[in-house]
Amino acid sequence: MKSVYNFVVTPVKSRYNNTKDIGGKELIVNTEIFNHQYVSREAIVKAIPTVGDTDIKVGDKVIVHHNVFRRWHNQHGIEKNSRSYIDEETYLVQPDQIFLYKDTEWQAQKGYCFVAPVKSTDKLSVDKEKPLVGIVKHTDGTVNKGDLIGFRPSSEYEFII
């Protein structure tokens, strides 16, 4: 299967990452489909768009938007798949829904930068991290890896990579 403008991907393990292995037994930590924190974001590229230029190749691992694999309830309470859904193993992903890709090393897509938090040294603060600063871990080339940067409020979104 190929798409003209979209990537074709498959989830790495499953649509949701809501289980943990504890003592050899599987524990389900969340049963809600609407909680974005438990939606899988890792995928493997099955096909690239036929139109456009991309550094992403078939077989690369990618980090996608949480709504790609997510299920939701419509206004009538009926459970639906995302618009990316083709079948349980196949999803169409728009280029702007891919944030990172990995052949051998993680690379950020154009327009994205991934920042690790800086631990707070302020003994009077209850915050574990310094607000609005971080160290660049994955970059699109606009800033250097390892740089200490500042960013605007509400421009951050947590990813665990």
Please place each PLM-identified region on the residue numbering:
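Acidic-enriched and Gly/Ser
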Residues: 1-161
